[in-house]
């Protein structure tokens, strides 16, 4: 220091920077779309620490431990394979002014916080209504819904309601191990790895996709435009989901907002 001079340090230098803790349950093509849209909308002035907890509550809890106070916002995609009640209780105890949930609305979490979500039951009903003219060329609709998964059971409720309303034969499969592929059937798949297996088995059975067998895949990704001249998809607008979550963070918004569902009809149906 220089004798006779007094230095003043602005309080602004000690203000906590705006930091976000971002927790995804897993990595996938559509999660990348959410991430890219979210971070692009936030811009370079916001710091984001990104973690993946692999649908595992123990890992989720470990990541959160001692970190809450360091962040301005905690943004979570809340899907778990196990210990759902413990996970929801932990989330419910987070400061609500910091909490932003993405992709899923959870009734067990109360208070004034922010959610950007999919309305699973209404979305599947809306999508199948949009595709009803194409579906009328088939008599049976089967959904591949893995028995051990984080997918919302409300998807099943909406699917079954639609099939019953329009008198389609329907079935819920946990996997494709013992499946007999017959003409007149439409398959709805949720998991990306099941889509590869499904297409391979249909082709091996020498059935034509788009006429004898229909395929509908959850979650639009760029590659689905190209597979078999185009796979029909039903999907949340993931870019909008990421952008909306970022806007809610930047504006310190509260409330629950459902993201529109989109149907992209292609040659597989």
What residue spans do the PLM features occupy?
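Amphipathic helical "hinge" segments at domain boundaries
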Residues: 7-66, 70-71
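N-terminal helix-turn-helix
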Residues: 1-2
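Flexible loop/turn connectors
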Residues: 181-183, 193-269
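Hinge/beta->alpha junction and helix N-cap segments in small-molecule ligand-binding domains
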Residues: 25-29, 51-58, 115-129, 143-181, ...
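Short, well-structured alpha-helical segments in soluble
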Residues: 59-73, 89, 175-182
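Flexible loop/hinge segments that line or gate small-molecule binding clefts
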Residues: 78-122, 219-229
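Hydrophobic alpha-helical segments within soluble ligand-binding/sensing domains
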Residues: 82-83, 105-142, 195, 235-254
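Periplasmic-binding protein-like
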Residues: 21, 71-80, 142-146, 183-191, ...
């Amino acid at each position: 220091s220089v004798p006779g001079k007094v230095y003043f340090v602005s309080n602004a230098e000690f203000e906590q920077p705006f930091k976000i803790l971002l927790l995804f349950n897993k990595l996938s093509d559509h999660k990348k779309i959410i991430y890219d849209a979210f971070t692009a909308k936030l811009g370079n002035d916001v710091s984001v620490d990104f973690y993946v907890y692999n649908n595992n509550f123990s890992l989720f809890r470990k990541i959160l431990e001692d970190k809450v106070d360091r962040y301005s916002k905690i943004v979570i995609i809340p899907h778990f394979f196990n210990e759902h009640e413990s996970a929801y209780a932990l989330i419910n105890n987070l400061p609500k002014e910091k909490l932003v949930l993405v992709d899923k609305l959870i009734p067990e979490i109360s208070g004034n916080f922010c959610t950007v979500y999919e309305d699973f039951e209404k979305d599947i009903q809306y999508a199948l209504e949009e595709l009803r003219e194409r579906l009328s060329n088939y008599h049976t609709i089967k959904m591949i819904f893995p028995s051990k998964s984080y997918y919302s059971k409300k998807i099943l409720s909406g699917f079954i309601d639609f099939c019953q309303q329009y008198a389609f034969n329907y079935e819920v499969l946990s996997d494709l191990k013992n499946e007999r592929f017959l003409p007149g059937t439409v398959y709805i798949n949720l998991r990306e790895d099941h889509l590869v297996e499904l297409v391979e088995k249909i082709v091996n059975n020498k059935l034509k996709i788009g006429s004898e067998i229909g395929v509908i895949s959850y979650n639009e990704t760029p590659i689905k435009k190209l597979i078999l001249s185009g796979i029909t998809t039903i999907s949340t607008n993931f870019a909008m989901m990421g952008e909306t979550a970022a806007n809610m963070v930047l504006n310190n918004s509260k409330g629950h907002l459902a993201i529109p569902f989109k149907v992209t009809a292609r040659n597989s149906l």
